[in-house]
Amino acid sequence: MPTHHRAVLLAIVLLGRATTGTAQVAVPAPAPQNPSPMVEHSRAHERIETRELPGPRRTFIGPLAKAVEVFVPGSTVHADALHLVVHFHGGAFIPEYAVSQLAGDHVVAVVNLAPGSGVYDRTFSDPAAFDSLLANITRETSATLSRAATFADVTLVGFSAGHGAIRAILRDSAHFDRVNAVLLLDGLHTSYVPENTVMERGGTLDEGNLAVFVRFARAAIRGEKRFLVTHSEIFPGSFASTTETTDYLVQVLGLRRTSVLRWGPRGMQQLSEVKMGRFEIEGFAGNAGPDHIDHFQAMPEFLGKVQSM
């Protein structure tokens, strides 16, 4: 992402306020981009109040010597079959709250590395990184439960830059097979070709970064996976927007967007949807920093949806 673009600090401030919880690991600020600096009041931008949730937590040192937080909701402690959710990018409270709202058999691990999807992609480009992450999560969960833990399925969630980790993980065929579901929260991006040349000026999308998501979407359409993508109307300028990348998926997969007008979680306003098999795209209004954070705050509802597909 070029450094000559002026950073907009609004999303950074809001992310810190919206995702920080008690005794939580520091969250990397978003990389500089260009959401609209406009102040608007047409959407509520509701925020889930941070509070203590029942259940044990453990922390271990993971990729890039960053702390990984593991939370086992109180209702999960006695579950026989466990389901793992690995969340990339964003404070731990929202993912913890999200899994606590599901059936009492989910465990969540939260990974935060640094601003920008490239850091997440490079870190997990070595398949051993994800293998190690899963092994450590299993170890910590087993220690928490005082018994050997095994996971019936794995769901990966990426907010914003966190999609870079999922992209890298899914490139490995064994990991592609291991992952059962993916949830992308306003975080499917790629570069322009040539770099910094928007589509209006003749640029195209770097399709290489999207190929594995096309493959996962095809598997979801066949009913083999579950895949939900949400996006805003933010136009970063220096790299492709989530609207452009989801349009690409729609085109390549031969699908069609349907216009809708309905309320979403946290006061969000949904404008479009795509549904085929177990693959869905939901498009929402908004091109400012708070609209981006809305998608993270709505993780409980979106995670519930992808898990019930």
Predicted feature residues:
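Bacterial N-terminal signal peptides that target proteins for export
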Residues: 1-8
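N-terminal signal peptide c-region/cleavage motif recognized by signal peptidases
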Residues: 18-20
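A domain-start/cap signature at the N-terminus of enzymes
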Residues: 24-82, 267-269
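Alpha/beta-hydrolase fold nucleophile elbow
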Residues: 147-160
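Glycine-rich nucleophile elbow surrounding the catalytic serine of serine-hydrolase chemistry
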Residues: 158-168
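Conserved hydrolase catalytic core segment
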Residues: 169-179
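The feature captures the conserved acid-bearing segment of alpha/beta-hydrolase catalytic domains
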Residues: 183-290
